[in-house]
Amino acid sequence: MVKNSFISIIFQEQEENKENRGSVEFQVVSFTNKIRKLTSHLELHKKDYLSQRGLRKILGKRQRLLAYLSKKNRARYKELIGQLNIRERKTR
């Protein structure tokens, strides 16, 4: 529950800036919220295959956005993954 409340605080901070709704950080935060909600849903409903597919699609979108942010601004990327408590993407 601590993670979810922390995510909500970050989300509210991002939401205060109405101009930044299209920013990469805001999109990653909103995808992370959706991922956490779907993950808790799938713990109860293991055979909900449509939700599993939706989760994989959202994970891919977030991964692509994080890769973009990593290339464009490494400092903002590091700060964001630190705030959201998510792992850094693997490099080849």
UniProtKB/Swiss-Prot annotation:
Stored Gene3D superfamilies: S15/NS1, RNA-binding (1.10.287.10)
Key words, A-Z: Chloroplast, Plastid, Ribonucleoprotein, Ribosomal protein
Main location: plastid
GO BP terms, alphabetized: translation
Localization annotation: Plastid, Chloroplast
SUPFAM superfamilies referenced in this protein's UniProt entry, alphabetically: S15/NS1 RNA-binding domain
UniProt cross-references to CDD domains, sorted A to Z: Ribosomal_S15p_S13e
Cited Pfam families: Ribosomal_S15 (PF00312)
InterPro entries per UniProt: Ribosomal_uS15, Ribosomal_uS15_bac-type, uS15_NS1_RNA-bd_sf
GO MF: structural constituent of ribosome
Cellular component, GO annotation: chloroplast; ribonucleoprotein complex; ribosome
Family, as annotated: Belongs to the universal ribosomal protein uS15 family.
Quaternary state and interactors: Part of the 30S ribosomal subunit.
Protein name: Small ribosomal subunit protein uS15c
Organism, scientific name: Lactuca sativa
